[in-house]
């Protein structure tokens, strides 16, 4: 995947995460702040940071619950070396339902 393709997929994914949280967080318990390639989610558990790392072609997640992760885009999913999926971690920790493959 070239840099342009990576940027488009990563930016679409990060925007999708922000959108899904805003749609499903009916109590407005998560403060969503999307600034460029960086998404901050301020929750009662702490602050999550999700950002695009262009040089590594990864999305990085910093979770106040489970720590840091680096995800690569392979076979239509953002997964880390241990096989964990970005959307699965966010679903579990934020109680927001995400599709595996955002459009």
Swiss-Prot record:
Origin: domain of life: Bacteria
InterPro entries referenced in this protein's UniProt entry, alphabetically: CyaY, Frataxin/CyaY, Frataxin/CyaY_sf, Frataxin_CS
Disulfide bonds: none
GO cellular component labels: cytoplasm
One Pfam family it belongs to: Frataxin_Cyay
Lipoprotein keyword on record: no
tRNA-binding listed as a keyword: no
GO molecular function: 2 iron, 2 sulfur cluster binding; ferric iron binding; ferrous iron binding; ferroxidase activity; iron chaperone activity
GO biological process: intracellular iron ion homeostasis; iron-sulfur cluster assembly
Keywords, alphabetical: Iron, Metal-binding
Family assignment from sequence similarity: Belongs to the frataxin family.
Cited function: Involved in iron-sulfur (Fe-S) cluster assembly. May act as a regulator of Fe-S biogenesis.
Protein name: Iron-sulfur cluster assembly protein CyaY
Organism in which the protein naturally occurs: Rickettsia peacockii (strain Rustic)
Lineage, top ranks: Bacteria, Pseudomonadati, Pseudomonadota, Alphaproteobacteria, Rickettsiales
Name of the coding gene: cyaY
């Amino acid at each position: 995947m070239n840099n342009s393709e990576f940027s488009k997929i990563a930016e679409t994914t990060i925007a999708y995460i922000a959108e899904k949280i805003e749609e499903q967080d009916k109590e407005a318990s998560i403060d969503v702040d999307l600034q460029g390639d960086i998404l901050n989610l301020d929750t009662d558990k702490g602050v999550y940071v999700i950002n695009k790392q262009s040089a590594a072609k990864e999305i990085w997640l910093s979770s106040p619950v489970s720590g840091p992760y680096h995800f690569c885009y392979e076979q239509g999913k953002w997964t880390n070396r241990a096989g964990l999926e970005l959307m699965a971690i966010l679903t579990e920790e934020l109680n927001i339902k995400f599709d595996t493959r955002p459009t």
